[in-house]
């Protein structure tokens, strides 16, 4: 995939930021499971939030390939930081595509400037991959809505100001009975549960939210009532490209760490890079990182070109997630016992990689989507 001068400039700027600002803090953030507030604000100053928000709405106006490049470079520094960029891209895309001019004016600028931290509130105890199982409800009461229910595993829940909440507005209408509401998470009736202690990406704050008779104004409804499920699905392709790019960043960081270590570590009187077994590990990491990167760029190109990108996005997300887990494991193997010890980057990368096979749709679901697309539309590219 050939990159434009703009692509390269943004990529290199993000890479420099990751090297100089993110990577030096990554181990401390992981150890302390701390929200990276100081990095978050700097990302906003650099214009790394809402990458694809049009210029006329106050955003950078970049394409999806630029978004993928930024996600990879941020993740190469620390995946938890890339998660923030990905989350902002999801919610700003929803606002750009489905918000009224008043809603965009009310929230968009503050999201881009890091004055408001968002949460994307979909998952519930009985509704993970199967979104049709959501039980959170929003009921009309005069000119307002009353929200009741609970969400779990919500990214940013402990620190967010604004929740984009999927709720059921018509219990009899199935997927057509869901709507999205923009909720002030400091409002009366909103309760935050304890922060989850996670295996990886520990600086990403995740926790439950509960809503007890939370009264919402009429303009909290985003888009058209009953279209919430379809609105959510409309941003999934871009979300999957983002997670795939994040996974590529993990793989790239592991490749760099393993290559450097193999040339420094000596056993039996020579560098371990001289041993064929280690060389094969490095070669396998390198080829799969590059293959995943090309799948990501291909999927991003299709989104930007207005082509049907569903299969391409699922292929990129599935392959890149599996790659990140397997090849970060290989990077640990190159390090040997050192790779199993906290404080070595590859140990963190291995833990950070696992979630890329799970969120934004499990890789089993991605395989189902790929097969469904093949069987419905044929195997021709």
What feature does the model see in each segment?
Residues 84, 111, 126-129, 153-156, ...:
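Short Gly/Pro-enriched turn/cap motifs at secondary-structure boundaries
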Residues 92-98, 120:
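Flexible, glycine-rich active-site loops centered on histidine and acidic residues
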Residues 143-144, 148-192:
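A short core secondary-structure module
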Residues 1-82, 86, 98-103, 110, ...:
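Alpha-helical interface subdomain recognition
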Residues 177, 192-194, 218-225:
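Short, charged, solvent-exposed linker or helix-capping segments at domain edges/interfaces
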Residues 119, 133-137, 144, 162-166, ...:
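Conserved hydrophobic/aromatic beta-strand scaffold that supports enzyme active sites
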Residues 133, 186-217:
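Flexible, small-/acidic-enriched active-site or ligand-binding loops
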Residues 114-122:
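A short, Trp-centered hydrophobic/proline-enriched beta-strand micro-motif
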């Amino acid at each position: 995939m050939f990159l434009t001068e703009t692509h390269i400039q943004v990529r290199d700027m993000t890479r420099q930021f990751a090297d100089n600002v993110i990577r030096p803090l990554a181990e401390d953030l992981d150890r302390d499971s701390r929200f990276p507030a100081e990095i978050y604000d700097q990302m906003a100053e650099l214009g790394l939030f809402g990458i694809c928000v049009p210029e006329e709405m106050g955003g950078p106006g970049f394409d999806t390939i630029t978004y993928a490049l930024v996600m990879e470079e941020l993740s190469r520094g620390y995946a938890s930081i890339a998660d923030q960029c990905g989350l902002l891209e999801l919610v700003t895309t929803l606002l750009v595509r489905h918000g009224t001019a008043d809603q965009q004016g009310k929230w968009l600028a503050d999201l881009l400037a890091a004055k408001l931290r968002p949460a994307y509130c979909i998952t519930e105890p009985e509704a993970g991959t199967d979104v049709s199982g959501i039980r959170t409800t929003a009921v009309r009461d005069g000119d307002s809505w009353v929200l009741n229910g609970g969400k779990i595993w919500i990214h940013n829940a402990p620190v967010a100001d604004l929740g984009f909440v999927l709720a059921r507005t018509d219990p009899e209408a199935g997927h057509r009975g869901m709507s999205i509401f923009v909720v002030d998470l400091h409002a009366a009736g909103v309760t935050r549960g304890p922060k989850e202690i996670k295996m990886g990406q520990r600086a990403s704050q995740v926790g439950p939210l509960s809503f007890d008779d939370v009264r919402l104004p009429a303009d909290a409804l985003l888009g058209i009532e009953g279209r919430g499920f379809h609105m959510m699905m409309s941003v999934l392709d871009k979300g999957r490209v983002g997670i795939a790019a994040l996974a590529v960043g993990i793989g790239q960081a592991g490749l760099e760490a393993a290559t450097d270590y193999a040339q420094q570590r000596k056993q039996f009187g020579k560098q371990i890079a001289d041993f064929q077994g280690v060389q094969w590990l490095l070669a396998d990491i390198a080829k799969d990182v590059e293959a995943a990167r090309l799948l990501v760029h291909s999927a991003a190109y299709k989104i930007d070109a207005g082509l049907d990108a569903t299969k391409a996005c699922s292929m990129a997300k599935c392959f890149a997630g599996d790659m990140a887990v397997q090849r970060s494991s290989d990077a640990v193997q190159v390090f040997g016992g050192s790779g199993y010890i906290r404080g070595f980057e590859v140990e963190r990368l291995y833990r950070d990689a696992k979630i890329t096979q799970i969120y934004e749709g499990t890789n089993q679901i991605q395989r189902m989507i790929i097969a469904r697309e093949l069987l419905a539309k044929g195997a021709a590219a």
